[in-house]
Swiss-Prot record:
Subunit annotation: Interacts (via N-terminus) with LSD1.
Gene responsible for this protein: AMC1
UniProt name for this protein: Metacaspase-1
Catalytic residues identified in the record: 164, 220
PTM: Proteolytically processed; by an autocatalytic mechanism.
Lineage, uppermost ranks: Eukaryota, Viridiplantae, Streptophyta, Embryophyta, Tracheophyta
Stretches with biased composition (Pro residues): 50-73
Disruption phenotype: No visible phenotype under normal growth conditions, but suppression of hypersensitive cell death response upon infection with avirulent pathogen.
Family (UniProt): Belongs to the peptidase C14B family.
Source taxon at top rank: Eukaryota
Alphabetical list of Pfam families matching this protein: Peptidase_C14, zf-LSD1
Effect of residue 220 to A: Loss of autoprocessing and cell death regulatory function
Primary role: Cysteine protease that cleaves specifically after arginine or lysine residues. Does not cleave caspase-specific substrates. Acts as a positive regulator of cell death. Required for both oxidative stress cell death response and hypersensitive cell death response mediated by immune response.
Keywords for this protein: Autocatalytic cleavage, Hydrolase, Plant defense, Protease, Thiol protease
Source organism per UniProt: Arabidopsis thaliana
Amino acid sequence: MYPPPPSSIYAPPMLVNCSGCRTPLQLPSGARSIRCALCQAVTHIADPRTAPPPQPSSAPSPPPQIHAPPGQLPHPHGRKRAVICGISYRFSRHELKGCINDAKCMRHLLINKFKFSPDSILMLTEEETDPYRIPTKQNMRMALYWLVQGCTAGDSLVFHYSGHGSRQRNYNGDEVDGYDETLCPLDFETQGMIVDDEINATIVRPLPHGVKLHSIIDACHSGTVLDLPFLCRMNRAGQYVWEDHRPRSGLWKGTAGGEAISISGCDDDQTSADTSALSKITSTGAMTFCFIQAIERSAQGTTYGSLLNSMRTTIRNTGNDGGGSGGVVTTVLSMLLTGGSAIGGLRQEPQLTACQTFDVYAKPFTL
């Protein structure tokens, strides 16, 4: 978001807490103030060379002045809140057509199905008019900080991402497959990607007891992008085992007592589909569409196992007789995901990872 300092001598960035929402902010070199992308508060930094010495006083110091316009963001202690990020990378060779639609559909689902307040949902897309809600690396980082800021028992948090994902060689030995999974912000070519280790440290490990986090990640190589300790390996018959993905180093990748569950678009070595076949009507990511469809069709109290099975079956049957007996919705889905072709299905399998193992056919799914 900020240009690098002109000096060739590297100086570590200074971190300050926002005077409004207390989110950690990275202060550009030489700056004396910074505006928070989340609550819009302006935090001023005194120049130590010119600031007068503090006067002794027995009176308590006044609270910092907050310059945030009211009603911009929810208070971070809401019972439910979500960060939804959809990136189309438009006008670039990486362009995706369906990701902003994914974000809008997920927002609609959270509000209408799971009773999230519209004010508790932070949207990051290229269509946002506020430049601080464009899905740059810095804005995404601050949004993730906001998501878990001050969370308490009873809170339900959601992180949805639709965009490019990648992976890179891991050298510290904490990955079973030898690769770190990554998310690609809008400016990833200049600012770099967000690595799974950082995502885990930001929104997983701080979760206290009683807080529930769900991530829905529609991206390539996203199977273990939250770096959670356990992966549910399920076959076509619906039988499953939990694979232990805890690092051999012993580094803890779980929570501080809370619950973290991730549903992702594909395995770490697979890619996720995005299509513009019906762009005059709609375009979306395969995983997000199947996730929402499975939720809408499910009965009250559906389990994680039945949800995952439904998503996998829909994707697997895409292109094979229009998805079976699903009717108009499935036929449209088939055209959408195969570009109008009736030949072959998609080669991606949604994955489930968690901080703890559980019976996926007994635990009800809810956000």
